[in-house]
């Protein structure tokens, strides 16, 4: 039963939004953004912006490669690989997201075991962030592939985003951003086609000269209704070392899960040295315990 929990929770999240599929597209990637409660649409300026907001790629000054691994509980794992390459008027990037749920116990309509089956999802993305005079713009195209037992579905999706920074806004810098994620015709398993988790997100982040950053974000689901909010902070504790704290309504643990006192709480750590970046984040995951994410990157 425990191996079935990740699938049930993903399906429940999709059901709450309506008949959606490919729920893995709404989980989030990278330890920095998750450590800040998912309030990253405005702040994203690294290779993980391929997921959060492709406009955040626009002003990358160096090439970056990053790999991220997440243990989401009960054998469910998420891996993310991205590469960003600055060009004359912006940055191009490519990324792969892969979610594996391992072996899941199958049962028929009467509850009798039918043997284990596998489930996995993948998204291959190409993105471009463009610098303009007034705002940075970005777009990405994704090829999607989903596999559940003997059923398989393929499809395409697209994201668009915008981002603008206001230097000299008081003692620091203000950044605002917005993105529309997972636009597309959905995925078709056998004869039924389900919608992708279309999301519209907008937020703001303020970075102080002291090294502190505060961020806020709201995300809506136009098809199924409902909204989520995220708050996060990043604090410089010494040169090259950052602590992060966040809270998200989307990642809040369900009541009675044993994690009520920490519902929605995320914590993280960031280290940077000689162009290498290491980030870690943890978030409450209800009955699955705590989800852990690790990201290793290199800028050159």
Protein language model features and the residues they cover:
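Single transmembrane alpha-helix segments in multi-pass membrane proteins
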Residues: 32-58
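Hydrophobic h-region of N-terminal signal peptides that target proteins for export
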Residues: 8-18
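Outer-membrane beta-barrel porins/channels
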Residues: 18-37, 41, 62, 70, ...
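Positively charged n-region of N-terminal signal peptides that target proteins for export
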Residues: 1-4
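Short helix-onset patch at the extreme N-terminus, typifying the N->h transition
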Residues: 6-8, 24
């Amino acid at each position: 039963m425990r191996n079935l929990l990740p699938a049930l929770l993903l399906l429940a999240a999709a059901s709450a939004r309506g008949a959606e599929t490919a729920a893995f597209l709404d989980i989030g990637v990278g330890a920095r953004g998750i450590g800040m409660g998912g309030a990253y649409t405005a702040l994203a300026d690294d290779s993980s912006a391929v997921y959060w907001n492709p406009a955040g790629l626009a002003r990358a000054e160096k090439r970056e490669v990053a790999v991220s691994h997440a243990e989401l509980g009960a054998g469910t794992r998420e891996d993310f690989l991205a590469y960003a390459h600055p060009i004359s008027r912006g940055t191009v990037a490519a990324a792969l997201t892969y979610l594996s749920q391992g072996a899941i116990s199958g049962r028929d309509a009467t509850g009798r075991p039918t043997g284990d089956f596998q489930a996995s999802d993948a998204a291959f993305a190409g993105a471009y962030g463009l610098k303009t005079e007034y705002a940075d713009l970005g777009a990405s195209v994704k090829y999607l592939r989903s596999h559940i037992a003997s059923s398989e579905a393929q499809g395409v999706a697209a994201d668009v985003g915008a981002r603008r920074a206001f230097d000299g806004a008081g003692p620091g810098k203000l950044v605002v951003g917005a993105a529309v994620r997972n636009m597309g015709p959905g995925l078709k398993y056998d004869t039924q086609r389900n919608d992708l988790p279309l999301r519209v997100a907008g937020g703001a982040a303020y970075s102080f000269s002291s090294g502190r950053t505060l961020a806020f974000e709201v995300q809506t689901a136009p098809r199924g209704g409902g909204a989520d909010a995220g708050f996060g902070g990043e604090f410089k504790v010494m040169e090259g070392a950052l602590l992060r704290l966040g809270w998200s309504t989307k990642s809040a643990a369900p009541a009675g899960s044993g994690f009520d006192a920490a519902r929605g709480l995320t914590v993280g750590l960031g280290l940077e040295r000689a162009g290498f970046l290491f980030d870690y984040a943890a978030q409450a995951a209800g009955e699955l315990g705590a989800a852990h994410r690790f990201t290793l990157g290199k800028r050159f």
